Each structure stands twice: as C-alpha cells, then as structure tokens.
Amino acid sequence: MSKAISRRNFLMATGAVGAAGLLAACGSKPAASSTASSAASQAPAASADESLALSDGPVSLSISWWGGDSRHAAYQSALEAFQAEHSNITVEPTFAAWSGWEEKMAAAFIAGNAQDVCQVNWNWLYNYSADGSKFVDLNTTSKFIDLTQWDAAAMDACYVANSQQCVPVSMTGRIFYWNMTTFNKAGITEVPKSLDDLMAAGKAFQEKLGDDYYPMHLGAYDRMILMVFYLESKYGKDWADPVTSTLNYTEDEIAEGLSFIKSLVDGHVIMPLPTYYGANGDGATHQSNEWITGKIAGIFEWDSAASKYQDALDEENKPGFTVGEEIKFGDYNGGFSKVSMGMAITKTCKNPAEAATLIEYLWNGDGAAIMGSECGVPASKAGLATAQAAGKINELVAEANGKVMSFVSCQLDPLFESSDLKATGTGIYQEVFDTVDYDNKSGADVVDTLLDGMSAVGYTV
C-alpha cells in the first residue's frame, strides 16, 4: 500500500501522542447512544407537511423486513391487527432471512421499486441514500408519527443529508454469552470478567474437556468487533471518526489488536477458523453442532440475539445459558452501541400518510405489544411501555441490552459495516482473519491488508 496517505503517515510519525488532541475520545463514561452524529445540528428540521392526509378510499401498502421465524410471525400478527383497525388499508409483506437480503434490497433501492415501508440497517442510510434521495424525511410525516417518543441522540443517528430518514427501532451492542453448563464441567463456576479469566478458561477447557471444547467461537466479523472493543478499552478513542470515517489508530496499534485476537486462538480460547469451517462451512454458530451440544461455550454477539442462541441449545445445555459481563480490557469502557435497525418510508411510496400511520402503530402504538422485543428492546418510549405492559419483552434480551447500554461509550462510523469489509466469505475482515488462522500470520503481517481494504471503501487511513 502506498505510504502517501497523509493521515496514516501522520499517525505513524506521531505515535498518536501528538495527534491526541485531534482524535475522538471514548471510554471515560457510558453514552446514551454512541452512533449519533452532529448532522442534526447542521440544518433546521423540516416541518410537517400539512398537505398529507389519510385517504377514505382503499389504500395498498407494502412493507419489507428480514429476520427469523419468530420475527416474521410477530410482524404478520401486527399487520393483521393493523389492517383490522384500518379496514381500508391492505399491507403486502415481503420478508426473508438475512442471507442475501441486503443485496436484494440494494438492487430495489437502485431500481426504485423497494417496498413503501422498509426495515433498514443504519448504514444503509449512508450506503444507499447519502444524498437523501431514497427515503422520506419523516419530519414531514410528524402529523402521523410521534417523533418525540425517541431520544434525540438515537434520532440524530438516523439524520442523514439533513433528513430524518428513519426512526430507530432499537439500539444494540455486543456482549458475551456463556454456556455455564460446559464451563462448570471445566471446573469454572463464574463467567469470565477479565482477559486473565479468558486465558485461564482456554487452558482449563483443553486440559479437562479436550481439544474439541472451546470457551468461545468468533467468526471474522465478530473478531473484528472484539478487536476494536479491545483497542478502545486500551486507548480510549473511537475506532474512527463517527462522521468522516477517519481512522484513529496507527498501524502498530492495529497490529497489536490483531495480535490480541491471535493470542485468543493460540490460547485455545476461541476455535480456529479452519476447525470451525471444516465442520460447518459458513453456517451460523447457533446452528452448529458444536454450539448446540456445548463444545463451543461462548459467543460475543448482539444483545438482541440472546433468545436465538439460548433456543438453539439442546436440553442438557439450555439451562446453562447466561448473559455475561462486558470485559474491560484496559482503563476505558470500550465498545459501541448502534441503531440496530430503523423503519423508513421510500420516496416512491404513493401513500406516505398511511405508511407513517403504520410505523406509528408498530412502534408507538398497539402493535408494539405484538412486536415486543422481536427486533430488540424498543427504542420508542411509548413502544417500550406498551410492550412491557403486555409482558412481551424477553428478559434475557432486556438484561443483555441493559448491560451493553450501561457500559459501552464509543461511537460507530458508517463505513465499519460496509459489505465489502464484513461480508462472510468475501469481505476484507474475512481475508485478514483467515490469513492469520490458516497461514499462522502475525498482526503485523496482515495490517496492510486491513488498511488497504478500509481505504478502498472510503476510510481515511
């Protein structure tokens, strides 16, 4: 890679000491939301479009989402209830699992034939509507959606190109989950709370349970998130500027983070990628026999994924499923929270008033009692209260979300989740960690591969 990139060379030369005043800081205390940008303060918000009105005649809407079976069922039940209450509105759903979903929706956004109401990933606002051309500014629909039910910081994270392009359905972050049934078999009775605990668990698993048992498995993208978590814990600065995606770390610091992940592999803490892929291919961890039977006894996953992983365990291991603690690898609280998903209205929608009414119903109104925590703990205050009153908030998800939100303090930039970086099998993160595991390379050996890939998607490195 060329050494002419000024920001990268600057950080190399200063060792980040002279640059400290220029870098975003995190870790000193938890933040209510750590994906918020300053965008919302750049221009006044659009006012409600007073010309919007609900139709008395028949209206057809379409909606799309991704997820698992339980989410599909919740959405469909909520849509049935909505249509019963609004007898002139028919809602046609389109839904599937995540695999291949972004590619399908990207094509639809480009072609201008996406559904009227879309469940969106936060970074889609930047990837597909950075100029505000794909999604309606929901400030114009505020006659029909009570936008005051969301915290300003969470709303700001969805404010792109001077437009409130979606409302946040939920906020999420990563946390450890452990199968204490297996940990107990290894003679460990408490969840890991430090790096020393992790390394001791790796040794105990290998010695007492055998080479086939591991405290944890992390795929390539999971490893990248944990690496960033580790670096933020140690250095107290965001991985990158949350608005400009200017990287805040030197090559040496990143190589250190990569070596941290390698030390977990070498210490039998996490299963080597060749071992996992040899048995499961690209299959999801919760669907692997190793997870189901307790041979993999831990993960580092989104707080909203708790139920999925617990439900996948066999009857022997299910009782041991435990929400762990965030691990402080340094002097700071590392890790980020982000908008888990949002709800947007496409600009091709012919009935934005009805579309906004549907969003209001699902996330602020009676539909929230049906949706519960299927899309995470609701970010809407009214939606959360409604779901709680209905007893529809999963206790594990709520516990995990509470631990995440009270700990993490760093900000996420919009390029971190670029599909060119995180795609399973083909992304740069995959290439980097495959090279470490398959070829036994050090962090210093692969840091340029990571930085080149980040630069290619728009990072200033």
Predicted regions and their residues:
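A structural signal for short loop-to-beta-strand junctions that line the ligand-binding cleft
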Residues: 108, 115-116, 145-182, 214-215, ...
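Glycine-centered hinge/linker elements that transmit conformational signals in sensory
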Residues: 202-203, 246-278, 327
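Hinge/lid segment of periplasmic solute-binding proteins
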Residues: 41-53, 122-173, 322-329, 395
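Mature extracytoplasmic/periplasmic domains
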Residues: 73, 81, 134-135, 304-311, ...
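Extracytoplasmic/periplasmic solute-binding protein
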Residues: 161, 165-169, 174, 199-247, ...
